Design a protein with these regions (language model features):
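C-terminal regulatory/interaction regions
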Residues: 217-259
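Active-site metal-binding loops of divalent metal-dependent hydrolases
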Residues: 15-16, 43-45, 68, 92, ...
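Conserved beta-strand hairpin/beta-sheet module of binuclear metal-dependent hydrolase folds
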Residues: 2-56, 129-149
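Divalent-metal (often Zn2+) His-rich catalytic cores of metallo-beta-lactamase-fold enzymes
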Residues: 138, 167-221
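Divalent metal-coordination and catalytic microenvironments
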Residues: 8, 30, 42, 67, ...
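Hydrophobic "anchor" residues on beta-strands that sit immediately upstream
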Residues: 38, 63, 114, 119, ...
């Protein structure tokens, strides 16, 4: 069921719940008042029912991709086949049609909505957030919500992908998001949140707490301790089902501390 969240943004939840996806992937549907067309952010996985529900909403000229993970990108070819949409992302592997790669600071006008692209690497190297406002407003203002994808979740904290994610980049991205002030958070998983400034500050504090715990663990376990050893020492407050994910974030913390 398509659920309105703001004047411009509605969410269609994919039925792919899990440890990493929470209730499932949030596919965001952006449409200005009176517009027949819509912009999709993250079509989700290759799920025929989900893609069918999206395609049935109406004309979709443009799909934007927040980052490379399959739970956000797997449905690209299916939605293009159904709608003929142009697909834009940072990575060239996800481009479809003639739109070209997305760039930091770029502004897009489509479906009666103004969308500003913001590079927020860390979770992955290609992670983006999208500021959403209405057409005709002056640049830099009027964006009432931010689609944060997996950089800020609706519940819990984000894993740093050890393939190409970076804690240093992630902390800088959180600081950039914090600087946007009190805007609505429309995440890639979990419920929407009311205050980006507050939640990004909490994320930064959480990361600093974990870094201090890792520093303490290294003093006890030795400087050569593995990420798994540190997880077993530090993450005693976390369900063991999440330890594999915690190991990725801990490896990112070790890489950060070891330079």
């Amino acid at each position: 069921v398509l659920r309105p969240v703001t004047e411009l943004a509605s969410v269609l939840l994919c039925e792919n719940p899990g440890i990493m996806t929470l209730e499932g992937t949030n596919t965001w549907v952006l449409r200005g008042p009176g517009s027949a067309e819509m912009v999709i952010v993250d079509p989700g996985p290759d799920d025929a029912e989900h893609i069918g529900r999206l395609a049935d909403l109406g004309p979709i000229p443009l799909v934007l991709i927040s980052h490379k993970h399959e739970d956000h990108t797997g449905g690209i070819d299916a939605i293009v086949e159904r709608t003929g949409a142009v697909v834009r992302s940072v990575g060239s592997g996800f481009l479809r049609g003639l739109g070209g790669p997305l760039t930091d600071g770029e502004e897009i006008d489509a479906a009666g909505v103004r969308i500003k692209v913001m590079a927020t690497p860390g979770h992955t190297a290609d992670s983006l957030s999208f500021l959403v406002g209405t057409r005709g407003e002056r640049s830099g203002g009027g964006f009432d919500a931010v689609l944060t994808a997996d950089t800020v979740l609706g519940r819990g904290t984000t894993v740093i992908d050890t393939e190409d994610g970076s804690l240093a980049d992630y902390l800088e991205s959180l600081r950039r998001l914090h600087g946007l002030g009190r805007r609505r958070v429309l995440p890639g998983h979990g419920p929407e949140l009311d205050d980006l400034e507050a939640v990004s500050a909490a994320y930064l504090a959480h990361r600093e707490d974990r870094l201090n715990q890792v520093r303490g663990a290294l003093r006890i376990l030795g400087e050569d301790a593995s990420a798994r050893q540190i997880v077993e020492h530090v993450y005693t407050d976390v369900d063991q089902k999440l330890w594999d994910a915690a190991e990725k974030s801990t490896q990112a913390q070790l890489d950060y501390l070891r330079g």
